[in-house]
């Protein structure tokens, strides 16, 4: 299927993942768009490093978890016949790291997957979504997973 006019310019796509079902669905969506547009998908996992540690601290357990998460994202892409590039980032906060990576890669789109989150009766966006919507120079799509019954 050829790209539509509204998505044909979306060739470089960044997708952060925490391994959640919603973020893996975002990977699948990004792969679908990039395949149609002959583009590339960069899947990121951000390890938030405490301020008491240096950014390059050896966080073996977090790295192992990140590797597993990125392997699942690669499997999602593989099932769609697509290959993604993956990277683990170390940062103090995930949101600025994601936007900075999108800028560095000259991304056309950031796809954010988020689960259905409610706290105190209100829907919560977390920290990444508002930051990306406010600061990313490219398009940002937020794909919210439906509430579980």
Predicted region positions:
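Short, solvent-exposed amphipathic alpha-helices that sit
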Residues: 29, 62-73, 97
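Glycine-rich, Arg-bearing micro-motifs that act as flexible, cationic patches
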Residues: 112-134, 148-149
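Short, flexible loop segments at boundaries between secondary-structure elements
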Residues: 138-149
């Amino acid at each position: 299927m050829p790209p539509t006019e509204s998505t044909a310019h979306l060739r470089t796509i960044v997708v952060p993942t925490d391994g959640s079902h919603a973020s893996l669905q975002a990977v699948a969506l990004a792969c679908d768009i990039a395949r149609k547009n002959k583009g590339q998908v960069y899947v990121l996992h951000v390890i938030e490093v405490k301020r008491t540690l240096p950014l390059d601290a050896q966080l073996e357990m977090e790295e192992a978890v990140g590797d597993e998460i990125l392997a699942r994202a690669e499997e999602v892409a593989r099932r769609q016949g697509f290959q993604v590039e993956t990277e683990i980032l170390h940062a103090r906060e995930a949101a600025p790291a994601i936007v900075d990576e999108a800028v560095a890669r000259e991304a056309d789109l950031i796809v954010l997957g988020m689960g259905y989150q409610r706290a105190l009766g209100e829907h919560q966006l977390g920290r990444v979504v508002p930051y990306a919507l406010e600061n990313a120079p490219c398009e940002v799509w937020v794909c919210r997973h439906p509430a579980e019954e």
